[in-house]
Amino acid sequence: AWVQRRLQMGDRYGMHLHLFHDYVESAGVTLRKEPNWGDNGTGYGVPLAAYTKDEQVRLIQYGLDLLFANGVPKTTLFRAGGWYANLDTLAALEELGFTADSSARTKYTFGRNKLPGYWDISPTMKPYYPSRTNQNRENPANEFPVLEIPDNGADSYAYSAADMIKRFTLNLGDGILTEPQQVTYLSHPHWFDDKEQARVRELFTYIARYNNADDHGPVVYSKTNVIADQWSN
């Protein structure tokens, strides 16, 4: 009911998937426990990309079916748990009719096992359609029809306010913007403690200096689905 109320108010949602063991088994997919970035045996740390393309289709479709069965309409937005999306993930999203993904980020390792990810984009990367052979690059002649909206502003759990402000200033540049740019920040509400809230307040206090609504600069706050519509082919 809460989700439905938010949708009625104009909010949109995207699917964010972690592969807990009971979820994978309920989806009818053979369970995998490796690779794992480090969890307590629940499957939370097993990346979606550990599974084949066809398995990923089944896992994602199962989640869509569960949502629909509980009165939540299908979404066309996605972000992989731990950002672990690969070319098979993008192919699965294409097959299932997703229009945008927000898993792309700068190069990283994650978790106590320091599992490397598949992304290696610039912090100033704009939304793009990934190449079918290199998800970190564009290739208009051979691209996925799934718009990649990079998580280029970093996340408030692992990064300091100064780090996130630096990402903003890199994307803002030194002069007048001559074309659109976007910066996406990520937070995890279930561990959004006082320290993290303070980092976010510091970040957005800084960004507010450039608010377009106050005639101070180019900053307009938006939602992922709006960005997807504005940047789509």
Short names for language-model regions:
Residues 2-5, 62-69, 134-135, 167-174, ...:
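A generic secondary-structure signal
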Residues 16, 103, 152, 222-227:
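Conserved beta-strand termini and adjacent loop/short-helix elements that scaffold enzyme active sites
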Residues 1-86, 144-145, 153, 180, ...:
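Metal-dependent polysaccharide deacetylase catalytic core of the NodB/CE4 family, i.e.
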Residues 100, 163-233:
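C-terminal domain-boundary segment and adjacent tail
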Residues 77-180:
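Active-site-adjacent pocket scaffolds in enzyme catalytic domains
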Residues 21-26, 84-89, 108-112, 157-158, ...:
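Short catalytic/ligand-binding loop motif for oxyanion handling, primarily in non-cytosolic enzymes
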Residues 4-7, 70, 86-99, 205, ...:
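Short, surface-exposed basic-aromatic patches at helix termini and helix-loop junctions that form
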Residues 48-62, 160-167, 195, 199:
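Soluble or luminal CAZymes and related metallo-dependent hydrolases
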